[in-house]
């Protein structure tokens, strides 16, 4: 039921009032590189939103080095509750991929994310 999902998300995000940030929008290892002058990111799908959205995508691509989180935390620490909000921010991408690309693994991942949000399995 979409109304139940929307209510759950609203409840979970009610006390989270992040400052809007310019987001990459498609952050994963295929859009990052390390060059002679340092790291580069490219192929953005930029928008303004919660900075946690970009970081929530990283676990969906396990090839990302864990140092990304360490570096991010050293510059701009994440507020408490990030891991609780992560499935909410992953849900859009998973549903979008399931619709666009199909495949049982994507449909299963999208269903698991929905279950995590609806069943309050969040950390």
From Swiss-Prot:
Alphabetized Gene3D superfamilies for the sequence: 3.90.1200.10
Family: Belongs to the fructosamine kinase family.
Keyword field contains Endoplasmic reticulum: no
Keyword Glycosyltransferase: no
E.C. code: 2.7.1.-
GO molecular function list: kinase activity
Active-site positions on this chain: 26 (proton acceptor)
EC top class, as a word: transferase
Name of this protein: Probable ketoamine kinase in tonB 3'region
């Amino acid at each position: 039921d979409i109304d139940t999902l929307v209510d759950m998300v609203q409840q979970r995000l009610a006390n989270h009032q992040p400052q809007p940030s310019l987001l990459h929008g498609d952050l994963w290892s295929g859009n990052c590189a390390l060059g002679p002058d340092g790291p580069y990111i490219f192929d953005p799908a930029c928008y303004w939103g919660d900075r946690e959205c970009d970081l929530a995508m990283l676990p969906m691509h396990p090839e990302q080095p864990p140092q990304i989180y360490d570096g991010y935390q050293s510059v701009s620490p994440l507020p408490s509750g990030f891991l609780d909000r992560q499935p909410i921010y992953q849900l859009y991408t998973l549903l979008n991929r399931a619709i666009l690309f199909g495949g049982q693994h994507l449909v299963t991942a999208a269903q698991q994310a929905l279950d995590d949000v609806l069943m309050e399995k969040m950390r």
